[in-house]
Amino acid sequence: PGMDFPAELRSEVPADKAGDAVRFDHVSLTYAGAGAPSLSDISFTAKRGQTIGVIGGTGSGKSSLISLIPRFYDATEGSVEIMGRPIRQYPRADLRGKVAVVMQKAQLFGGTIRSNLLWGSQNASDADLWAALETAQAAEFVKAKPLGLDEPVEQGGRNLSGGQKQRLTIARALVGKPDILILDDSASALDYATDAALRKALAALPGDLTVFIVSQRAASLQHADQIIVLDDGRMVGLGRHAELLESCPVYKEIYESQFKKGDAQK
């Protein structure tokens, strides 16, 4: 590791306390072999401590956008900065420590609840684990298990419900104390009350955790500091919920279609 970096960049990169958490400057992404770009000319700034929503229809580019933040892919055009530095200056291992991604499909391993959470950080104390479980709205169901943290987990978490698995993977990400947490539709198996409690607990965490919430549900993003609205790889809206209802037809359409179904009530 570090072989592809100039010598002065190989050491641990100190977090630049002056920089914004994430900055996209005219970013486009075309996957190898694809004719059309998956993202075109995306620019936004996420300040430290903000919650950023990302919404759009299927295939609008939501997952492509957030895949650039942990550098699963590199932008084809434009630049991405993390904590005030160009993303390519970070050794990938350092970046993975700063950016935690929780996917919709929760990945759990055979073992115990504790051993799964310790993937987030091998040095975490039980107090750290319980704090992460509280924030992730998982403490209650873990406490209800006969063995608590030592409760067995089957490979893939087969002995847990979808919502329990998702909450444990969110807790595991929090154990690593990242600077940036990305929830990629990862609250989709949670009911509204739990989803709302999770968002509230994340917002109340001390420090400057920046949270990206990718969701199909407008209701999940109503309290975000900024919402990025994507349509066919382009950013068609950027603002808060109330602003976007006025200014962004794509957002308004998503919200109203869900509201009519009773989805957006809470």
Q: Where do the protein language model's features map onto the residues?
A:
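ABC-type nucleotide-binding domain
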Residues: 5-266
